[in-house]
């Protein structure tokens, strides 16, 4: 049995490419996406306790810390799987923007599965953790896998890809809330003028061709979210006007990420975005592999 304390970094993710192929009869959308973890992360400290309680504390005042938190849900699923023998106290340092389309909750859940597995003496393989993690959320298995991956089906079919070549990123989250359900409900799959070249992007990743990746950035959900929230398009345009190689909305939004060919350009653009749009959640980071 493991014991003591474990500290885990839980990394955010962005979608380099997001395509929706069709709406299935069960109401879910069939997707084809390239997912990528980035340097921006939350930090979680786990302490094993013997009272079989799940206790969560955080430096963020914006999150539920009860059974509605994905950390709690992940702990519950893990303890059910192994037959609970201990409890856990979790402290979450929140750095990933909340409700931003960056899997902030899912990555915290993934870190919880990994830490509890370690504290329990590794009863589950990574494959097993990914299998049970889907009970907590569709993005959680990917957040356990990390790195660069192709995601298909309704997001549950994952294929690991080689790491993307290093790049400097600016992440900017406007101060608005976007409902993922609203975006998918209003997406007109049959009326899309164009689809991102996910296969071409995968080929570029496999050739370590960063330019080929950046010029193929695409997200069909922009067709819904940007008309509803024009500031997203304005932030993208500001990134491009300030030296970005390309820029895209991540997931269902509202976060925008932009790729730069130097850290200096990224820092300058971040400063410009902060001042022009009065944004607090603007970060300079990079692609992050395992």
Protein language model features and the residues they cover:
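Glycine/serine-rich anion-binding loops at beta->alpha junctions
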Residues: 91-120, 138, 245-260
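Residue-level signal for inorganic ion chemistry
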Residues: 16, 44-46, 71, 105, ...
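Conserved, helical-rich catalytic subdomain that frames metal- and/or nucleotide-binding sites
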Residues: 145, 150-246, 261-264, 270-274, ...
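ATP-binding N-lobe of GHMP and related small-molecule kinases
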Residues: 2-100, 118, 122-127, 154, ...
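Contiguous, small/hydrophobic- and glycine-enriched helical/loop subdomains that border
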Residues: 109, 113-150
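Short, basic/glycine-rich phosphate-binding loops at helix/coil junctions
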Residues: 50-64, 112, 207-217
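Hydrophobic C-terminal alpha-helix "anchor/cap" residues
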Residues: 35-38, 133, 239, 273
């Amino acid at each position: 049995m493991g014991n003591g304390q474990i500290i885990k970094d839980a990394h955010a993710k962005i979608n380099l490419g997001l395509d929706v192929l069709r709406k299935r009869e069960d109401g879910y959308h069939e997707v084809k996406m390239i997912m990528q973890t980035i340097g921006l992360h939350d930090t979680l400290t786990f302490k094993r306790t013997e009272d079989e309680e799940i206790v969560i504390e955080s430096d963020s005042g914006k999150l539920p810390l009860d059974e509605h938190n994905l950390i709690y849900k992940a702990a519950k699923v893990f303890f059910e799987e192994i037959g609970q023998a201990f409890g856990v106290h979790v402290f979450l340092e929140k750095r990933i923007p909340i409700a931003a389309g960056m899997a902030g909750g899912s990555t915290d859940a993934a870190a919880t599965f990994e830490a509890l597995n370690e504290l329990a003496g590794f009863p589950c393989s990574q494959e097993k953790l990914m299998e049970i993690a889907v009970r907590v959320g569709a993005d959680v298995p990917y957040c356990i896998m990390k790195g660069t991956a192709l995601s298909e089906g309704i997001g549950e079919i994952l294929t690991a890809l080689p790491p993307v070549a290093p790049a400097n990123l600016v992440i900017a989250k406007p101060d608005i809330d976007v409902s993922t359900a609203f975006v998918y409900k209003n997406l007109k799959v049959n009326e899309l003028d164009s689809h991102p070249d996910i296969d071409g992007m995968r080929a570029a990743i496999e050739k370590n061709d960063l330019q080929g990746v950046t010029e193929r950035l695409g997200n069909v959900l922009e067709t819904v979210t940007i008309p509803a929230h024009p500031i997203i398009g304005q932030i993208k345009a500001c990134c491009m006007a300030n030296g970005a190689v390309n820029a895209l909305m991540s997931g269902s939004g509202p976060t925008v990420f932009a790729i730069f060919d130097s850290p200096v350009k990224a820092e300058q653009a971040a400063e410009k975005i902060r001042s022009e749009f009065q944004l607090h959640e603007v970060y300079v980071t990079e692609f992050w592999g395992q």
